[in-house]
Design a protein with these regions (language model features):
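OB-fold ssDNA-binding interfaces and closely related basic DNA-contact patches used
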Residues: 1-176, 227-231, 241, 286-300
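Intrinsic-disorder-associated interaction segments
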Residues: 8-11, 187-190, 194, 243-254
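Generic hydrophobic, helix-prone segments enriched in Leu/Val/Ile
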Residues: 37, 84-85, 114, 158, ...
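Extended serine/threonine-enriched, polar tracts that run as long, contiguous segments within proteins
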Residues: 153-241
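Accessory, usually C-terminal, subdomains that scaffold auxiliary metal cofactors
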Residues: 215, 219-290
């Protein structure tokens, strides 16, 4: 078996594994400190005293961007933002409503460069249950499968840094500081939003330009549902008038995003491996175990 035979203090992760340090890690995994960017579809209401009466008021409007920062456990809002996209990935996800003692959960796949391949998910399956390949006749599928596919969302995952314009807190109070260059992840899963957010990347691809060299301004547009409710989609504007410099700090942030995706994919793959074997028939599981035994004997 190949092992690292030279001590490299600049590569802690690889050396720690070789030196048997991995087993000393705390079993309680640290939560991701990457801020989450979303669109806030519903207004946040507050109360104010007007002429001696307490009245309900809208303190944060619907259609604002919401940034959840786990480091401080705070959430910030802004009607307009500017993002510097470093990279994008693609995945599938499906919400599963809990019943009884079973909690709500998301079935999620690994992240990939495209959706043109089968993606392992955290339940031991592929594509969150969506059949592999192109579906020529959706209506010919069994009704249960049609319903399952309707629940599965394509997700465009954006990694970058964000500037919030005139940010507020959840009470609608203006912040006394700027919120700039904050690393974030944005899972874009609404169909129209998926398309809109992808347009700047398509434009840059045609021009053979890298997304990290430009900014994208983001606001929102309102949409109406048949029942009268509203939701919002991103309104994005790619700014190619300024080419942003790439210094060592940008390189470090980019590497941290790549590491984040690697760690996420390793976790999903580990879940897939555990549950895929458990989902096999007893005969298939025995066959897998036999292969593992043979492989182990050869290795030793």
């Amino acid at each position: 078996m190949n092992q690292v035979a030279t001590i490299d203090t600049a590569n802690y992760e690889a050396m720690a594994k070789v030196m048997g340090m991995v087993g000393e890690q705390n079993s309680d995994k640290a939560k991701s400190t990457l801020a989450r960017l979303r669109i806030n579809h519903s207004a946040i209401m507050g109360t104010a005293e007007i002429k001696g009466k307490s009245m309900n008021l809208e303190v944060v409007g619907g259609g604002t961007y919401r940034l959840e920062v786990p480091d401080t456990d705070e959430t910030y809002y802004a009607s307009s933002i500017s993002i510097r996209p470093y990279m994008q990935r693609f995945m599938y996800k499906r919400f599963v409503k809990g019943r009884g003692t079973i909690k709500n959960m998301f079935v999620k796949t690994v992240m990939a460069d495209s959706l043109n391949v089968d993606l392992k998910d955290n339940t031991g399956g592929l594509n969150c249950g969506k059949p592999a390949g192109y579906i020529e006749d959706f209506k010919a599928l069994p009704e249960d499968m049609q319903n399952l596919i309707r629940q599965i969302k394509r997700v465009r995952v954006i990694f970058g840094t964000v500037n919030l314009t005139n940010p507020t807190n959840a009470n609608g109070d203006a912040l006394n500081r700027e919120m700039n260059e904050i690393p974030f992840i944005w899972e874009v899963d609404q169909r129209e939003a998926f398309k809109h957010v992808g347009e700047p990347f398509q434009a840059l691809l045609k021009q053979r330009r890298l997304p990290v060299q430009y900014r994208i301004g983001c606001e929102t547009d309102e949409r109406k549902l048949p029942n009268g409710n509203t939701y919002y989609v991103p309104n994005v504007n790619l700014d190619t008038t300024e080419v942003l410099p790439i210094g060592e700090d940008i390189q470090d942030t980019f590497r941290s995003f790549v590491d984040w995706v690697t760690n996420y994919n390793e976790y999903i793959t580990s879940e897939w491996e555990d549950k895929h074997v458990n989902n096999l028939s007893s005969e298939d599981a025995s066959l897998v175990e036999e292969f593992i035994t043979v492989d182990t004997s050869v290795e030793n």
